[in-house]
From Swiss-Prot:
Binding annotation for Mg(2+): 405
Protein location: Cytoplasm
Native source species: Enterocytozoon bieneusi (strain H348)
Molecular function GO terms recorded: aminoacyl-tRNA deacylase activity; ATP binding; magnesium ion binding; phenylalanine-tRNA ligase activity; tRNA binding
Enzyme class: ligase
Main location: cytoplasm
Entry's family note: Belongs to the class-II aminoacyl-tRNA synthetase family. Phe-tRNA synthetase alpha subunit type 2 subfamily.
Pfam families: tRNA-synt_2d (PF01409)
GO cellular component terms listed in the entry, alphabetical order: cytosol; phenylalanine-tRNA ligase complex
Catalytic activity: tRNA(Phe) + L-phenylalanine + ATP = L-phenylalanyl-tRNA(Phe) + AMP + diphosphate + H(+)
Protein name from the UniProt record: Probable phenylalanine--tRNA ligase alpha subunit
UniProtKB keywords: Aminoacyl-tRNA synthetase, ATP-binding, Cytoplasm, Ligase, Magnesium, Metal-binding, Nucleotide-binding, Protein biosynthesis
Length: 488
């Protein structure tokens, strides 16, 4: 007789039955009950049970007595050498104070002897938790987990089950007399998960940043070059050659090719950059507004400017775009310095990796060039940008940057870390940077740069940047990430 029929027969005479009454495995019962309950023939509840059971070794001790008790029996007949006795047996015999050592011989101590271990095993259900754990350490007992099913009649209960019609066909469509035999639709079934390729959360956020920039009227810069000369990355930005960030502790220098020939840089522009950096007197070309800055008052080396590096910021691209803008206006009859540019790409810093820093990360950068721009317009633009990202808690802190003055650090509040974390830097590009390029004095360029990863951490509620980027993140994290991030 089948398990299904056994259940139906028992329920015909009893209102409720237990799976213990069925002489079969719970795994077999579970499948039958799922089938019957889907037809509403039976209802059932699962009661998890934890049992204390004897191991094979425990059953032997229950039957024949513990090793320490049997040791005492042997000692009653003759003395034994300590070398011939199991250490575990000795341990428990000494613990019970049944034996003692005399002249390297084990002898009885004279105390009353009772096989406590055997007694505990025979009363397994009533012993304390500590006593059970002690027996478990000796591998005499174990825990057995199982499910007990309490089964009752369902609304469609019938001892004689008719076959359910699972599908309609041209043969049975017009010949079904009892529609109750049609299998009901189950709208509560969990969906079948289908796994497709998923975009990394940073890729999605990058697309949203790009959309926001485009909405604000910005054009995207081409940032395909990871390797830059030190000239464009540092010198064109009026960053002194003895600045700490230009040392190997902060910057990745290339071994091959080690130097850049600077063929993409006009020699006269190199001279103007050298003049603004150096204390030496170098003639400035006619037609360029002269910068009266004292510079850095140090000797500028073109050899240092030729060193190839992995770019430390995308501002290296910004400086090239601004130089092209200035040069094109020098040749144009109608001047137009109004431009809004942005970039989102990787940069590299030789930093110690920790919860909020990586050696490789994405930099988001925006700049606006035009007349009558100042710190007020910069703050307004940054706040507008972050409002579109739905990050409203923004602070500014005065800072120093070699190529911007005034400069400000941008901080955003992290709800999970419950503290303000640095998002990026901002400022107004110095005349020492712009005038050698060919900009007139009345043109101002405001700019800001920030990490892509930091806002992503805030929106995803992550405390460690390595949970967002790296080999340890799970596929499920990527698959389950929201389609749109910045709308909440």
């Amino acid at each position: 007789m089948s398990i299904e029929q056994d259940i139906l027969n028992l329920l015909a005479v009893k209102n409720i039955i237990s799976s213990d009454e069925l002489n079969c495995k719970s795994t077999d019962i579970h499948g039958v009950l799922l089938s019957l309950s889907s037809k509403k023939v039976v209802d059932y509840t699962i009661i998890p049970i934890v049992e204390r059971v004897l191991t094979p070794q425990g059953r032997q001790v229950e039957k024949e007595g513990s090793q320490e008790y049997n040791l005492i029996t042997m000692l009653m007949k003759s003395n034994l050498s300590i070398d011939n006795i199991d250490k575990t047996t000795l341990k428990y015999a000494f613990k019970n104070k049944w034996i003692k050592m005399e002249n390297n011989q084990i002898v009885l101590s004279g105390t009353t002897i009772q096989d406590i271990t055997q007694k505990l095993l025979r009363n397994l259900d009533s012993i304390s938790k500590d006593e059970f754990e002690e027996l478990k350490k000796r591998k005499l007992v174990d825990i057995n987990k199982k499910n007990i099913y309490k089964i009752t009649r369902g609304e469609n209960f019938n001892i004689e089950q008719k076959d359910i019609i699972n599908e309609l066909t041209t043969q049975n469509l017009f010949n079904i007399s009892d529609t109750s035999l049609l299998k009901k639709y189950n709208f509560n079934l969990s969906k079948v998960s289908r796994f497709f390729g998923s975009l990394h959360p940073l890729t999605k956020i990058k697309s949203e940043f790009k959309r926001i920039f485009l909405e604000m009227g910005f054009s995207e810069m081409n940032t395909g070059k990871y390797v830059e000369s030190s000239f464009w990355n540092f010198d064109s930005l009026f960053q002194p050659q003895n600045h700490p960030s230009r040392e190997i502790q902060d910057t990745f220098f290339l071994k091959v090719p080690r130097l850049n020939d600077l063929n993409d840089v006009d020699s006269q522009y190199i001279n103007r950059v050298e003049s603004i950096h150096s204390s030496t007197s170098i003639p400035v070309d006619e037609g360029y507004d002269k910068c009266y800055s004292k510079g850095h008052n140090n000797v500028w080396s073109v050899a240092e400017a030729k060193k190839n590096i992995l770019r430390t910021h995308t501002t290296a691209i910004s400086s090239q775009m601004l130089y092209k803008l200035a040069q094109s206006n020098l040749k144009a009859e109608i001047k137009n310095y109004n431009i809004k540019l942005f970039s989102i790409d990787k940069v590299f810093r030789n930093e110690t990796v920790d919860a909020t820093h990586l050696a490789e990360f994405h930099q988001v950068e925006g700049l606006i060039s035009g007349e009558n721009l100042g710190i007020k317009e910069l703050i307004h633009t940054i706040k507008t940008f972050f409002t579109k990202l739905n990050i409203h808690q923004i602070r500014f802190k005065p800072a120093f940057n070699p190529y911007t003055e005034p400069s400000m650090e941008i901080f955003g509040y992290h709800p999970q870390l419950k503290k303000w974390i640095e998002l990026g830097n901002s400022g107004i590009f110095r005349p020492e940077m712009l005038l050698p390029m060919g900009f007139p004095k009345n043109v101002v360029v405001i700019a800001w740069g920030l990490s892509l990863e930091r806002p992503a951490m805030i929106k995803l509620g992550l405390k460690n940047i390595r949970d967002l980027v790296g080999h340890k993140i799970s596929v499920e994290f990527i698959r389950d990430s929201p389609v749109i991030f910045m709308n909440k």
